[in-house]
Amino acid sequence: MNLYASGEDYVEAILVLYKKFGSVRSVDIARHMEVSKPSVCHAVNILKEGFLTIDENHFLYLTSQGKVVAEKIYERHRL
């Protein structure tokens, strides 16, 4: 599955927040990206198809594929 730019923004945000705080929830992404919680929910539902997982406490984790994509985006934006 290919990601659009907005999907890339979400996986990068998850990576950044995880590195900073050690855990990520949808509300954290909404605050970080300054978007609505329903927008995050929609993106998360799409990204669950290969890029992230959600545990029973609603914490978000990047899959190995998600981490690879997020790291590439993060490095590209740092340049």
Segments the model singles out, each with a brief description of its role:
Residues L52-T53:
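Short hydrophobic beta-strand motif reused across regulatory alpha/beta modules
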Residues H58-R76:
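Basic, amphipathic "hinge/linker" alpha-helix immediately C-terminal to the N-terminal HTH DNA-binding motif
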